[in-house]
Amino acid sequence: METPENRAAFQSASSLADACRDRQILEGRAVICDSSHNLVVDCGCMRGLIPREEGAIGMNDGSVRDIAVISRVNRPVCFLVTGFQKNEDGKTIALLSRRAAQELCMKEYVSTLVPGDIVNARITHLETFGAFADIGCGIVSLLPIDMISVSRIDHPRERFSVGMDITAVIKAIDNGRISLSHKELLGTWEENAALFSPGETVAGIIRSVESYGAFVELTPNLAGLAEIKEGISPGQQASVYIKSIIPSKMKVKLIIV
């Protein structure tokens, strides 16, 4: 919403009309979802209306539920301006389509993506098995929990929060469904290990406690093994002494202080 192009389009009715003519994808905040599940959007110089059937790809055939529209209230939504009309008070409002923006995004952007591409994404919601991220115009892809980082976590909220902007890698595309990965962007084992030296005492997070030791996260893509110490539990902050770093085995040995 804060791009110069977006701000310029919201300046006046004529600039919104230009955006309509040029089929420019804009983004505004949804402020109301009425009883018919139409979305009212703040377009700066005027209010805009996204009719329910224009709320998302799949609304018309029932493959997308109404909650996909209702949940957009107080959140940014992408859309195309499709026209203008007077409301019952005689005020001009912009007619908008999120569905059309999604179709344009699919055609000109998403359809060109291949595994290995790096994309910008925004976290939309979190589940125990992964994070869902908007890769453009409300087109959502899954980032599985084991693809978030090398260091294991119990829940994606340990890395992300809803509304957070991240970069991700296209991991796979299967029948139009896109899965993402994030851990490739956090550096290799060697790059992360180079940040530390034996003899240092550093901060870490206990990630798991096993019979043979405790795994302690030093960075999201680097963990070391420490002997179990009484009273430790997963998620706990800890100070650890780096006993050794063994590049040939990609191992870090630690002592919990």
Please place each PLM-identified region on the residue numbering.
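Single-stranded RNA-binding regions, centering on S1/OB-family and related RNA-binding modules
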Residues: 1-257
